[in-house]
Each structure stands twice: as C-alpha cells, then as structure tokens.
C-alpha cells in the first residue's frame, strides 16, 4: 500500500512529505514510516545544501566589497598628508546595471525526491476484522444546536394618514418628495436615514432670509486683497562678509596651490545689475595720437610709426615773416592769380571757399605765431620709440606683479607671439627699427614742389 500524498502545498513549494494513514496493519505502518523518514532525510539534505550554497555566494560578495573598501581606504591614506589640490571625477551614472537582477528562490530547479519510483513491498498479514467495537472507537458524538433564532423582520410603517385624505389619488403628489404619512424615513446620502414628521416639514418649509454679511451686520470694512506677484525677482540676499587672509600657511588638510578669483565666472543672479570693471587708462601724445586696435576682444600692440617727411628747404632757409607784412603780400598774389586764371571749379565754389581769409589763412597765421619749425618743440623718432618701449616694459612688469590674472597673462602671451612672428622678439638681431626702418631710410626724400601759389590752391580744391 502506497502512502497518500497531501496536495495542500503552496505555490512554488517543491517538496511534499507523505503522511501515514490510520488503520494500517502493523507491518504496513512500519514500512510507510521508514519510507517517510527516508524521504524527509533527502528533503532536509537538499534544503541545507542549497542554503549553504547561498551563504557561500553571499560571503564571496561581501569579500569583494571588503576588498574595494580596503583599496579605497589605502588611496585615502596615501593622499591624506598631501597639500596639493586633487580633482576627483565621479561617474555620471550610478554604478549599477541598468536592469536589476530579479530575485530567485533558492529552491528553483529543485526536484521532488518522491517522484522517483520506490521499491514495492509485499505484506503477508491480513487486515483486522471490522466489528462493533471498532465502529464505536471511530464514532465521535458532537452536540449541535439546531434551534433557529427568531429574526426581527417587522418593519415600521409610515403611520396614519391625515384626516382630510378622502381617496387614494390624493396620495399621489406630482413632482415632490413629500410623503403624506405622519412618520416616514427620509434618506439623506450625507446624514443617513432620518425620520421626519409633518411638524418638522412645516417648520422647514418656512422660507427664511439668509444672514446678512459681516460688512452689514457688524459694519466692518472689507480689506482690499493685494494681488500676488508670481514674477521671478532675483535677490542676492544678505551675504555675511568674512574678513580672512588670502593665504593660510601650514594648515592640515588645506591645499596651498589654489587661487580663486572672484571676478571670473558669472554671478549667482545673472539678471541682477553687475559691477563694471575698471578699465586701464592710456596716455596719449600730442604729436601723434595712440590708436588702440581691438581684434577679437584682445588688445594688439600699435604698429611702428612711419618716419617723418623731410621739411621743405624753402621754409627752413627763409626767415619767418611777421604776420603784418605776410598777409597783404599773400592777398595781392591771390588777386593777380584769380584775375589772370579763373577755373570753372573756383567759379562754382561757395563764397566761404573763395574767400581767401578762411581757415587756411588762420592755420598759416597760427603756424607763424608759433615760430615755425625752428621754435616748435618736436622730438625725434628715436626718443619716441624709447619711451614707448619703456611704457611696454612697465606695463608688463605691472601685469606680472599683480599675478594670477587670466586676461593679463593671455595678453602678454599674445604680444610675445606676435613679436616672434614679426621678427621683433628679444632673440632677433635687428635694431629697434627693424627691416621697415632700414627700407624707409633708404628711400630718398622727395624734391620740394616748384609751383605758384595759385596752382597749389587749385590742386587743393580738386583733391
């Protein structure tokens, strides 16, 4: 006889230990007990082996995590005493797989040992004969009360009708929820079942005015509500000012090779009005104005000035004339020339241009009053070049003394690169003038123009 297997197992439960049935023969009961104990031993051995495998797997994971922790601790100990700034780059993604591994039970893939075919045993003994005594042993009397409990199903009626109702049709009221019964149940979904009578209904049917608002009853004035502003208004807030030194030497855990410049980078409130940085002042000369070229937002050094043209020999040799004698001579010459040769360009010119006492006469008069070339305080080109060179060196020294400014370093590097490209660097063997100065020196000066004064005026107007 094979043992009966219980099928009340849960979902995913693999093992099912058989139970020993009652009323078995002695030999049969002993055989089933031995089979059940053997099956239970196999099941317990399989369960504990799977648990030990899971524990070993978890222990290996914990050991790998411990190795990572020890490696990170060793790196921290190595850089703990360093005073250099170290950048730590963290991964942009969380160090985990995109799809987590689903949890699997440790009993997945387990097979029920009871499904294997077991040996069959032949039993010689016979069953015990069933008699009256055996039936009485199996009989268990149970007291059960079969008396039904009385149910209270009596429902309360609606009560009596009013005395003025004479027919059934009077009970039908069109488009109302009122019941003519003296006592009925009014169903309210919010308050529940409420029993009302006609007296209560009569009190409710009286129309009442609503209470007056507080502004009328208590004569209070309503406060005007201020509309809320949902626009974004950036506010820097009150930032505490901390007066600390810029360099703190010999502090543990503090780097000494970092420099922070507050002017670089945008502010925390881009829409707030920012402070305008102070621009450097440039000194200009009277004889030659300094032109600053801007290329892509970077200052470029000014080009070398060309050599001055040679002075005319007539002005250098002739003594300066007084303004009283020079004016009538010039006017007489202009009158003779204008009467002899009248060009169409002069005839079509306006009156201010034809008038000889215009801006040109005042310019010549101011030159004569200044004393001419002999008394003019002019400097040579070598002095100008030396002064410009000294100014550049002072600006470079001032920029390097400030230290750490990004724009000044970039400007100095660009200046040195341009000097190296143009051949004006410190390693070049040429003089301060360079190749351009030597070429300009080799060009002979132009001869002075030998033309009358009237033709000069006509050429000026045509140009």
UniProtKB/Swiss-Prot annotation:
It holds the Pfam family WASH_WAHD. Residues 347-463 are annotated as: VCA. Residues 300-312 have a biased composition (Pro residues). This is Putative WAS protein family homolog 3. The VCA (verprolin, cofilin, acidic) domain promotes actin polymerization by the Arp2/3 complex in vitro. Residues 1-54 are annotated as: Required for WASH complex assembly. The lineage of its organism: Eukaryota, Metazoa, Chordata, Craniata, Vertebrata. InterPro entries: WASH1, WASH1_WAHD, WH2_dom. It comes from the Eukaryota. It is found in: Early endosome; Early endosome membrane; Recycling endosome membrane; Cell projection, Lamellipodium. Belongs to the WASH1 family. It comes from Homo sapiens. One of its GO terms (molecular function) is alpha-tubulin binding. There is a cross-link at residue 218 (Glycyl lysine isopeptide (Lys-Gly) (interchain with G-Cter in ubiquitin)).
């Amino acid at each position: 006889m094979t043992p009966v297997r219980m099928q009340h197992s849960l979902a995913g439960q693999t093992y099912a230990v058989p139970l020993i049935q009652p009323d078995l023969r002695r030999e049969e009961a002993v055989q089933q007990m031995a089979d059940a104990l053997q099956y239970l031993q196999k099941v317990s051995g399989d369960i504990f082996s799977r648990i030990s495998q899971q524990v070993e797997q978890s222990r290996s994971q914990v050991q790998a995590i411990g190795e990572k922790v020890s490696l990170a601790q060793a790196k921290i100990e190595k850089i703990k005493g360093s005073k250099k700034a170290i950048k730590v780059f963290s991964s942009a993604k969380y160090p985990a797989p995109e799809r987590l591994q689903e949890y699997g039970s440790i009993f997945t893939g387990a097979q029920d040992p009871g499904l294997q075919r077991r040996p069959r045993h032949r039993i010689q003994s016979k069953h015990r004969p069933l008699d009256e005594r055996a039936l009485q042993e199996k009989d268990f009397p149970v007291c059960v009360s079969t008396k039904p409990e009385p149910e209270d199903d009596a429902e309360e009626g609606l009560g009596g009708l009013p005395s003025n109702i004479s027919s059934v049709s009077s009970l039908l009221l069109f488009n109302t929820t009122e019941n003519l019964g003296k006592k009925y149940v009014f169903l309210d979904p919010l308050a529940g079942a409420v029993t009302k009578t006609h007296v209560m209904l009569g009190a409710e049917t009286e129309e009442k005015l609503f209470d007056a608002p507080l502004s009328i009853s208590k004569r209070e004035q309503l406060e005007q509500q201020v509309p809320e502003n949902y626009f974004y208004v950036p506010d820097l807030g009150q930032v505490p000012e901390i007066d600390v030194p810029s360099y703190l030497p010999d502090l543990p855990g503090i780097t000494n090779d970092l420099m922070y410049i507050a002017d670089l980078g945008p502010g925390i409130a881009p829409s707030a009005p920012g402070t305008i940085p102070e621009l450097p002042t440039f000194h200009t000369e009277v004889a030659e104005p300094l032109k600053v070229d801007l290329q892509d937002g970077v200052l470029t050094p000014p080009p070398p000035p060309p050599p001055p043209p040679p002075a005319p020999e007539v002005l250098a040799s002739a003594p300066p004339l007084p303004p009283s004698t020079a004016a009538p001579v010039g006017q007489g010459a202009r009158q003779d020339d204008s009467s002899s040769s009248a060009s169409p360009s002069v005839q079509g010119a306006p009156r201010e241009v034809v008038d000889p006492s215009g801006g040109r006469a005042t310019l010549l008069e101011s030159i004569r009053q200044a004393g001419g070339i002999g008394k003019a305080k002019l400097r040579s080109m070598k002095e100008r070049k030396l002064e410009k060179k000294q100014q550049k060196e002072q600006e470079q020294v001032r920029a390097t003394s400030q230290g750490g400014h990004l724009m000044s370093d970039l400007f100095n590097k660009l200046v040195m690169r341009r000097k190296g490209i143009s051949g004006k660097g410190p390693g070049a063997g040429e003089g301060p003038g360079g190749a351009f100065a030597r070429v300009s020196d080799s060009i002979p000066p132009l001869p002075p123009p030998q033309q009358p004064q009237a033709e000069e005026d006509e050429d000026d107007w045509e140009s």
